[in-house]
């Protein structure tokens, strides 16, 4: 890679974070907001994407062409994109190294069906499993996840809120620790309507994410 375009908030995967920290890449951030993601502070430019929400296709194409020209990039031949699509389709299907992996992928695949519930992903290991296991190029379900310093807090309550806001069913998949942190949200008052909410709990040895972080190099494995 020589040039990276960053959209959204790509800080979940350690491998992507490492890529964004490379000094030999020309990084451009495209943003629709006043705050943007620049993980390592190496972005050379920040380009506002201020087009209207429902922009005509020809106007959007023209704006995109101007953006490419301003970055000094040349339009790639269609065969270039096709070669990458073929390469992605030829990748071996990621293997499930544990039963927790298998559950997460099964839930993801079931949620790709037409009319499937909105999918709510628990923080920590659950969302990272699917970041690793979800196949590129496949139809993705509508998925929602909490992010933040206390991402596992309120996961079930978030599912109830999604149901109330959307009026449609919600399917939540989370680890055991995330479930325990918010099990009280399964309670409801005698006059409250029962939410159309599925809660799938993966027994993944709560707090297992810490064994994948820097702490694991200084602490005995049994502590995790």
Residue ranges and their predicted role:
Residues 79-167:
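Active-site diphosphate/adenylate-binding microenvironment
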Residues 13-16, 37-40, 129-131, 153, ...:
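Short helix/loop capping segments that flank catalytic or ligand/cofactor-binding pockets
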Residues 1-4, 108, 219-224:
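Short, intrinsically disordered, charge-balanced linker/junction segments flanking boundaries
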Residues 1-85, 189, 214:
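Glycine-rich, acidic loop regions that bind phosphate or pyrophosphate groups
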Residues 134-224:
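Thiamine diphosphate
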Residues 6-8, 30-31, 120-122, 173-174, ...:
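Short beta-strand segments
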Residues 3, 118, 169-171:
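Structural motif
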Residues 9-12, 33-35, 124-126, 177, ...:
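Short glycine-rich anion-binding loops that position phosphate/pyrophosphate groups of nucleotides
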């Amino acid at each position: 890679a020589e040039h990276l375009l960053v959209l959204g908030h790509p800080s979940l995967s350690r491998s992507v974070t490492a890529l964004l920290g490379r000094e030999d890449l020309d990084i451009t951030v495209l943003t629709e907001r006043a705050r943007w993601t620049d993980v390592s502070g190496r972005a050379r430019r920040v380009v506002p994407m201020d087009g209207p929400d429902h922009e005509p296709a020809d106007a959007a194409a023209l704006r995109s062409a101007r953006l490419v020209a301003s970055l000094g990039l040349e339009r790639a031949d269609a065969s270039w994109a096709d070669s990458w699509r073929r390469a992605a389709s030829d990748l071996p299907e990621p293997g499930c190294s544990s039963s927790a992996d298998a559950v997460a992928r099964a839930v993801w695949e079931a949620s790709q069906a037409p009319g499937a519930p909105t999918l709510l992903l628990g923080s920590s290991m659950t969302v990272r499993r699917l970041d690793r296991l979800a196949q590129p190029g496949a139809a993705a379900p509508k998925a929602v996840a909490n992010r933040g310093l206390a991402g596992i807090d309120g996961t079930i309550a978030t599912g109830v809120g999604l149901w109330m806001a959307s009026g449609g069913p919600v399917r939540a998949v989370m680890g055991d620790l995330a479930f325990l942190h918010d099990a009280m949200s399964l309670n409801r008052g005698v006059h409250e309507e029962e939410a159309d909410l599925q809660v799938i709990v993966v027994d993944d040895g709560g707090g297992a994410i810490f064994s994948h972080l820097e702490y694991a190099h200084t602490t005995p494995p049994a502590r995790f």
